Amino acid sequence: DSEFAELKIRGKIFKLPILKASIGEDVIDISRVSAEADCFTYDPGFMSTASCQSTITYIDGDKGILRHRGYNIKDLAEKSDFLEVAYLLIYGELPTIEQYNNFTTQVAHHSLVNERLHYLFQAFCSSSHPMAIMLAAVGSLSAFYPDLLNFKEADYELTAIRMIAKIPTIAAMSYKYSIGQPFIYPDNSLDFTENFLHMMFATPCTKYKVNPIIKNALNKIFILHADHEQNASTSTVRIAGSSGANAFACISTGIASLWGPAHGGANEAVINMLKEIGSSENIPKFIAKAKDKNDPFRLMGFGHRVYKNYDPRAAVLKETCKAVLKELGQLENNPLLQIAIELEAIALKDEYFIERKLYPNVDFYSGIIYKAMGIPSQMFTVLFAIARTVGWMAQWKEMHEDPEQKISRPR
């Protein structure tokens, strides 16, 4: 039998359907409130509002659980590769060997970008931020695929594959242009993660040998950042897509949202904070500053909008960080890691942080890994965008396949 919640407004009672979730909290359907009760609901930041039904990602923030299509994120990070997870998010199931081989072949086939796109890069000054270049380049893809501006259902999968394939190429080109080096073309003999590292660090006169530990770490980072429910950038992609805008335009809006320091730029802020702390001896002083309401200092990398427990992605990255630094001979002498480990240990025992449920999040260790890999801080958010493009495309595809989909129009 259907369940209802009762809402009393000005003496009149309205029955609101309670929608049963397949997992997690049930939802009160308020879609008819404005029409029947002559008033709106108010929820700044959509803290308590579900904007859509989705079967892609599930989070239980109190228990520190993150699942994609029912699979635990830790299992995916340790047992899958990024394109296998991409297939899972887009199609809803893990691929067979044949499906996986076909999918990876298609991604490799579409990794090249049109040569004319090179001219777009020349319009930027050499000091341009790679995210600014990437934002423009991704949006410009609309001009190269005019036949896909009016999407049909058959185009969803091809568009997703094209986007997943071309984003790493554009990302690497953005980096190469920012440092004045020639663009490096994709190499289809390499897998997805190896290919990106190749395009980032090879030159026409020097080959780049991919370290398997580095490759494995980056693969995990990509998986851990692939999707995360209706966050700011994903919601932005869905809102843009709800108007019928093409996927290239939608993804560029997601990149713009991700660029914000409160969203995709947090791991860079963690690195800056660890540098500011400087040494383990200074940690108590900065802990005190974080507790002081009148002090503008914030302890970056702690706390999360959703998680009120240890971020499961952070747990994987902590061990990944140690593995990378051990491989590079930095495990015992990397000052940022030592400060991070001691800062975490102190904070997790402090009543101030325990009461507020402030635990390390995914950004706390990822920046240290990137720095050890030789990836500059201005590229951190770019790598986030590479990974999250998979989630954006899965969400974009799901939105278009939803019979209840409407153009987004907050009041």
Swiss-Prot record:
InterPro entries: Citrate_synth-like_lrg_a-sub, Citrate_synth-like_sm_a-sub, Citrate_synthase, Citrate_synthase_AS, Citrate_synthase_bac-typ, Citrate_synthase_sf, Citrate_synthase_typ-I. It catalyses: oxaloacetate + acetyl-CoA + H2O = citrate + CoA + H(+). It is an enzyme of class 2 (transferase). The active site is at 304, 363. Keywords: Transferase, Tricarboxylic acid cycle. Pfam families: Citrate_synt. Pathway: Carbohydrate metabolism; tricarboxylic acid cycle; isocitrate from oxaloacetate: step 1/2. Belongs to the citrate synthase family. This is Citrate synthase. It comes from Rickettsia australis. The lineage of its organism: Bacteria, Pseudomonadati, Pseudomonadota, Alphaproteobacteria, Rickettsiales.
